Amino acid sequence: MQHIGVVFGQRTQLWWDLPVVESFELLRSIYGVSPGAYKARLAQLVEQLDLGSFLDTPVRQLSLGQRMRSDLAASLLHNPKLLFLDEPTIGLDAVSKLAVRAFIRELNAQHGTTVILTTHDMDDIEALCTRVMVIGDGAILSDGPLEALRKTVHSERDLIMDLERDVEVDERDVRIIKQENQRVHLRFDPALISTPALIGRLTARYPVRDLFVENPPIEEIIAQLYRQRAIE
């Protein structure tokens, strides 16, 4: 356990009635971290996770975002090489989610910590993961880079186009997902028509004010993978 850290989004490892810092002291003793190493590590984590204002607050009085940041710090006091995160952003507001994700990215980049993340939040996957494993009915359905999953399961891309005025859009080689007023949502396969070619064709035919291209939401890709495997 010296090289492993664990955080559960719905269960804390901190002592409910103790101030945060006293829970940290107990964990320091459990993991056998020397006082000097603990002091340096704690100072670093307090700064990175902005814990200073509630270190002396009992855990039961913390907000969910504060508790999650405290749990992250607790799991890292012994500087583990492997960190397991189970639903680390569940229930968090937008600001807290961004802060937690930024910290996890920094942890991996600066310290080389391997992070294994389980989540139902697809935004967590897109923001944090370089390798994605999809599991269904106890079996591994996909294992590899996120971009490879996109290409294998769902090769299409989305193009969102804002027009200067209301115009009916009718195009070959593309599907019109939705058209609301001057905004048109198209989906196309780059294997059939390249992105530059499609953009050139659209801007020549329609009064385009703005447009952008993006990948379909990761939720759609995962759902399509489950549907494909169900058919098989």
Model-derived segments and spans:
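ABC transporter nucleotide-binding domain
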Residues: 101-189
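Conserved ABC ATPase "signature" region
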Residues: 25, 29, 37-54
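Short, charged/small-residue-rich alpha-helical element at the C-terminal edge
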Residues: 157-228
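Hydrophobic anchor residue at the start of the ABC signature
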Residues: 72
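Catalytic Walker B motif of ABC-type/P-loop ATPase nucleotide-binding domains
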Residues: 83-87
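Conserved catalytic motifs of ABC-family nucleotide-binding domains
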Residues: 79
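Conserved ABC ATPase signature
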Residues: 17, 58-62
